[in-house]
Amino acid sequence: MLENIQAYLSKQGVKYIKPEKAGLHQEEMEDLKALAQSARKEMQVLSKALEERLTPFKMDRVSNWANQAQICRPHFWCYYKAPEDSLDDVAMAIRLYGQPKDWGVSVEVSFIERKKSDTTLAKQHKVLDLPIAPSLYYFAQENGVSHRVEGTEDNRQMLKEAVRDKVLVKYDVPVTTSETIEELVEKLADGFDKLKPYYEKANKN
């Protein structure tokens, strides 16, 4: 299951060069592009299957397999928004994490960077108004650097008092080779249920 995603995770940071310009590496680059496109397709299938479990949420597009500098970005993400959400509201998302031998999909309460407004960060910070539930954790960004923060009451208070660029609430779902897409979707849907109160709190006026 999701074999192409798993294989593509090892390509984090690899520079893609158009095959016709890659000289001796032409075949290698053709293989890389084929793998990247197959991995993204798997992520699209997973995201769509999850969307069907998350009515009325609608998925946004899955992130590209490389950035503008043509550096491979295998940790795909996909945002989900409810019909009544405005462009700059806080959203829910899934995002890949890890390396081929130890990887998974995290569910998070986050926002789309390119659509944020002056009020988006203030909305996002409201996730700290609710006590943190078991199995959830924070992902705090400070001066552009993000790091994991254990989900404890002490840390919640610490994050509330300190000004952070961005604080996400996240839930990790490790992926095993033996499980099916349907089983993974159920676990991710459960993650959405766990995080929904934080999403609702963030968007409440």
Q: What do these predicted ranges mean?
A:
Residues 1-54, 148-205:
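Long, solvent-exposed, polar/charged low-complexity segments
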Residues 9, 77-91, 130-134, 158-168:
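Short, Lys/Arg-enriched charge-dense amphipathic segments
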Residues 44-74:
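Short N-terminal edge-element motif at the start of the domain
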Residues 60, 83-97, 136-142, 166-173:
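Short, surface-exposed, charge-dense and proline/glycine-enriched linear segments
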Residues 66-129:
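Aromatic- and glycine-enriched beta-alpha-beta binding-site module
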Residues 78-80, 105-107, 138-139, 169-171, ...:
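Generic structural hydrophobic/aromatic packing signal, biased to beta-strands
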